[in-house]
From Swiss-Prot:
The gene is gatC. Belongs to the GatC family. This is Aspartyl/glutamyl-tRNA(Asn/Gln) amidotransferase subunit C. InterPro entries: Asp/Glu-ADT_sf_sub_c, GatC. The lineage of its organism: Bacteria, Pseudomonadati, Pseudomonadota, Betaproteobacteria, Burkholderiales. Disulfide bonds: none annotated. It comes from Paraburkholderia xenovorans (strain LB400).
Amino acid sequence: MALTLTDVKRIAHLARLELADAEAEHTLVQLNDFFGLVEQMQAVDTTGIAPLAHPIEQIEDVALRLRDDTVTETVEREAFQRPAPAVQDGLYLVPKVIE
C-alpha cells in the first residue's frame, strides 16, 4: 500500500498539521518505508507459531523477573486528609470555582 503526496497532505490536514512541501515529501518516504516493512512482516508465514507476550523469554540467558502481583500499599486516606482544611465523607471540600 503506497501512499501518494496527496494522501500525506490530506492526512496532515485532517491532523491539523501544517507541512511544507519538503516535509511532506520526506514524510511520504518515511511512511512508505514503514508500510513496506509492515507488508514484509505480513508476508511471513507464522502458521503454528504461538504468539509471545514477552519475546525476550525466548532468550535462554535472560530470565524475566516479574514481581508477584500483590498489594504493597495501604489506604492512608485519613492520614492524607488530616492536614486538609475541610473534608466530608472522605472527600476534600474546596471553594466553588464555577457558578
